[in-house]
């Protein structure tokens, strides 16, 4: 990959990773429009690491409080709202881990194609619109409980289907369960930490065992660009949804889905 490709693809990944619009739907566009080849494992390591660092940096205070409360609850047996939230995040991660390990080959072989991505982009966009429209109660993330956490975790596992969008699926589920827009987004972002960490570790392991030459320039540039893009994205996304809701992202998904359908049928 040349420098231009690294910057463009890292920007796309960073900007779309935490928006409910599907990063895979966007990463397929350069391949369709510009005939770019697969990004390679070095790039995958870079964008996973950059996205992880962005969400950890943005929520560093919350994550520190949660970690300290969680370790304290193990030692003392006493639960606080931060320790409960930590346990719910762990619980919500389990379905994606199970599905990821058992169905990764099937997903990569049969579902990573433009037809599936176009369909899921549109379908889950409509589900996001419906969930946002029906949202009324406005619970915060400290009121999730283990049952809601498990349901949101199942939605995250479903998001392994390309085009679904991890943040889109989890925010949709959280809104359906009565969380406020901001709480749904925060819970989704916090859920991304163990998932992104696991993904970064697995892709790094694949890279080291593949025997591929490591492109350190692409690796470093991809981390920096995806980190900056993801950090900015998180900050402004939380501001946008508090004022405008999910409608702009729903419209965008429908337009994007239509564009992808155009590549299929035209």
Swiss-Prot record:
Residue ranges crossing the lipid bilayer per the database entry: 1-21, 39-59, 87-107, 111-131, 144-164, 183-203, 218-238, 246-266
Single GO term (MF): undecaprenyl-diphosphatase activity
Keywords, sorted A to Z: Antibiotic resistance, Cell inner membrane, Cell membrane, Cell shape, Cell wall biogenesis/degradation, Hydrolase, Membrane, Peptidoglycan synthesis, Transmembrane, Transmembrane helix
Membrane topology: Multi-pass membrane protein
Chief site of localization: membrane
Keyword Kinase: no
Major enzyme class: hydrolase
Cellular component GO terms, alphabetical: plasma membrane
Localization annotation: Cell inner membrane
EC number: 3.6.1.27
Additional facts recorded: Bacitracin is thought to be involved in the inhibition of peptidoglycan synthesis by sequestering undecaprenyl diphosphate, thereby reducing the pool of lipid carrier available.
Purpose of the protein: Catalyzes the dephosphorylation of undecaprenyl diphosphate (UPP). Confers resistance to bacitracin.
NCBIfam families registered for this protein in UniProt: PRK00281.2-4, undec_PP_bacA
Reactions this protein catalyses: di-trans,octa-cis-undecaprenyl diphosphate + H2O = di-trans,octa-cis-undecaprenyl phosphate + phosphate + H(+)
GO BP term, example: cell wall organization
Record flagged with keyword Zinc: no
Pfam family, one: BacA
InterPro entries for the chain: UppP (IPR003824)
Family, per entry: Belongs to the UppP family.
HAMAP family: Undec_diphosphatase
Protein name: Undecaprenyl-diphosphatase
């Amino acid at each position: 990959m040349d420098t231009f490709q690294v910057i463009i693809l890292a920007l796309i990944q960073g900007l779309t990773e935490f928006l409910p619009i599907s990063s895979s739907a966007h990463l397929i566009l350069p391949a369709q429009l510009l005939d770019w080849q697969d990004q390679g494992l070095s790039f995958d390591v870079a964008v996973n690491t950059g996205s992880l660092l962005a969400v950890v940096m943005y929520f560093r205070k919350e994550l520190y409080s949660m970690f300290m409360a969680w370790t304290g609850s193990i030692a003392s047996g006493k639960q606080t709202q931060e320790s409960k939230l930590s346990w719910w995040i762990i619980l919500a991660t389990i379905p994606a881990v199970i599905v990821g390990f058992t169905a990764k080959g099937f997903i990569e072989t049969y579902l990573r194609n433009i037809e599936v991505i176009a369909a899921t982009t549109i379908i889950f966009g409509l589900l996001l619109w419906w969930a946002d429209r029906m949202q009324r109660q406005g619970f915060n993330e400290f009121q999730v409980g283990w049952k809601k956490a498990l349901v949101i975790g199942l939605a995250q596992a479903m998001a392994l289907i390309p085009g679904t969008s991890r943040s889109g699926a989890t925010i949709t589920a959280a809104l359906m369960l009565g969380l406020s827009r901001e709480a749904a987004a925060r819970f989704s972002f916090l859920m991304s930490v163990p998932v992104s960490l696991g993904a970064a570790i697995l892709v790094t392991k694949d890279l080291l065992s593949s025997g591929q030459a490591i492109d350190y320039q692409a690796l470093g540039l991809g981390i920096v660009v995806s980190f900056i893009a993801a950090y900015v994205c998180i900050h402004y996304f939380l501001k946008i949804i508090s004022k405008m809701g999910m409608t702009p992202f729903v419209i965008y998904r429908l337009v994007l889905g239509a564009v992808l359908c155009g590549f299929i049928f035209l």
